[in-house]
Amino acid sequence: MRLVIARCSVDYAGRLTAHLPSAPRLILVKADGSVSIHADDRAYKPLNWMSPPCTLKEGADGEAGVWTVVNKAGEKLIITMEEVLHDSSYELGVDPGLIKDGVEAHLQELLADRIEILGEGHTLIRREYPTAIGPVDILCRDANGQTVAVELKRRGDIDGVEQLTRYLELLNRDPHLAPVRGVFAAQEIKPQARVLATDRGIGCLVLDYDAMRGIEDDKLRLF
């Protein structure tokens, strides 16, 4: 993790153009290759960012104070440094990730046990499928043999869709798994999250936790 605090301006060139005028900002460069630019008044949300995979070149075009960040689609972030106030790097190592609350963990267990809830013919590959950026809740195959990555939440918001998007970008680089499609599953999915998921070709599934627990209870009573 590299943290840079600098007075800088930022220009984005891609599907549209955007400009951030000169101001003091925090720039985060993460080990996964992502670059994000933050102000002091937007909670955790960046002003602009570039998701991995992307490349960062410092001093592009012979200018020591210019950073150029380019993603695989050719979109660019050009960060013009006027004054660097802080620049430090820390090796954080592999994060263990969030420990799911009881409901999310139980949802994962129930869905893995009754994978046909996702559709007839689905088969489980494994729960907590490990990746370089954290475990995928459920990895399975559909009736056609296509790999499916499932992200589970109690309440599905945009952050969950973004998380699943990152997993899909990574998994689709594996020739043994690709093509991989995504399913965003939650007890409740917010409208904005559903719109974003649909735009990215990610399926949405609303889970009835009480009904799923009822399925489990019936199974236990049979034995």
Swiss-Prot record:
Domain of life: Bacteria
EC code(s) of this entry: 3.1.-.-
Alphabetical keyword list: Cytoplasm, DNA-binding, Endonuclease, Hydrolase, Nuclease
Gene3D superfamilies, per database record: 2.70.180.20, 3.40.1350.10
Pfam hit, one: NucS_C
Positions of disulphide bridges: none
Record's keyword annotation contains Transmembrane: no
Family from the record: Belongs to the NucS endonuclease family.
Source organism: Streptomyces griseus subsp. griseus (strain JCM 4626 / CBS 651.72 / NBRC 13350 / KCC S-0626 / ISP 5235)
InterPro entries cross-referenced by the UniProt entry: Endonuclease_NucS, NucS_C, NucS_N, NucS_N_sf, tRNA_endonuc-like_dom_sf
Cellular compartments annotated: Cytoplasm
Name this protein carries in UniProt: Endonuclease NucS
Primary location recorded for the protein, binned into one broad class: cytoplasm
GO molecular-function term, one example from the UniProt record: DNA binding
Gene Ontology CC: one annotated term: cytoplasm
Protein purpose: Cleaves both 3' and 5' ssDNA extremities of branched DNA structures.
The keyword Oxidoreductase is annotated on this UniProt entry: no
